[in-house]
C-alpha cells in the first residue's frame, strides 16, 4: 500500500513540478523559436493524443460543481484521474473516502476543512500550485468560498474503486437510504 501511495504521489508531483522542468530541457536542446514564428504541424495523435477544451466532457452542474474524467474510472479497479471544478459558494458535506487520493490545485483557491461539522468558517485556503493528499478514512469536506473571483480547479488522482461515505456531526457514517 505504501508503494502505491508513493507511486501516486510521485505521479502528481512529477506532473506538477517535473513536466515544466523537462519542457525547459527539451527546449534548450532544440532550435530557438518564439511565439512570433510559424507553428509546427499538429502532433501525431498516435504519439500525443489531445482533447481540446471545448471537447472535454463535463458532468455535474455548471455554477456549482463539475467533474471531467481524464483517465480511468473511480468506480473500477485501477488508477484514475479527474478534473474537479468548484464554483464559488459551493461545498461538499463532511465525508471520507476509503482510498487515498492526491490533488493538485490548477487554478483558483480550494477551501478545505477537516471538521465533522459543516461550517464554512472552518475552511482553509489551498492555493493554486499546491499538492494535497486526501488521506483514506479521514473526514473532510471542500469547495470554494463565496466571493472567490474564479472556480477552484484541481486534478485528483487515485486508485479505484473508491467509496465515499457521508458522516454526521460526530464523524460517524450516515445511514444509507434504502434502494427504491
Regions found by a protein language model. Give the residues of each.
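Short beta-strand His + acidic residue motifs that chelate non-heme Fe in jelly-roll/DSBH
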Residues: 92-94, 112-113, 134, 139-147
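A short, N-terminal "cap"/entry segment at the start of jelly-roll beta-barrel domains
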Residues: 29-80, 169-180
Amino acid at each position: 500500500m505504501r508503494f502505491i501511495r508513493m507511486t501516486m504521489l510521485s505521479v502528481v508531483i512529477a506532473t506538477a513540478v517535473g513536466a515544466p522542468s523537462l519542457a525547459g530541457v527539451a527546449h534548450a536542446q532544440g532550435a530557438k523559436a518564439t511565439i512570433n514564428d510559424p507553428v509546427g504541424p499538429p502532433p501525431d495523435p498516435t504519439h500525443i493524443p489531445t482533447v481540446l477544451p471545448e471537447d472535454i466532457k463535463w458532468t455535474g452542474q455548471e455554477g456549482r460543481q463539475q467533474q471531467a474524467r481524464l483517465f480511468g474510472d473511480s468506480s473500477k479497479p485501477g488508477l484514475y484521474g479527474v478534473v474537479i471544478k468548484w464554483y464559488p459558494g459551493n461545498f461538499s458535506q463532511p465525508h471520507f473516502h476509503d482510498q487515498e487520493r492526491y490533488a493538485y490545485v490548477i487554478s483558483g483557491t480550494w477551501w478545505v476543512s477537516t471538521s465533522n461539522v459543516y461550517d464554512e468558517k472552518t475552511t482553509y485556503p489551498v492555493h493554486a500550485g499546491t499538492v494535497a493528499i486526501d488521506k483514506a478514512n479521514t473526514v473532510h469536506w471542500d469547495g470554494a468560498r463565496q466571493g472567490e473571483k474564479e472556480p477552484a480547479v484541481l486534478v485528483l488522482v487515485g486508485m479505484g474503486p473508491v467509496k465515499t461515505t457521508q458522516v454526521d456531526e460526530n464523524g460517524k457514517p450516515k445511514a444509507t437510504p434504502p434502494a427504491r
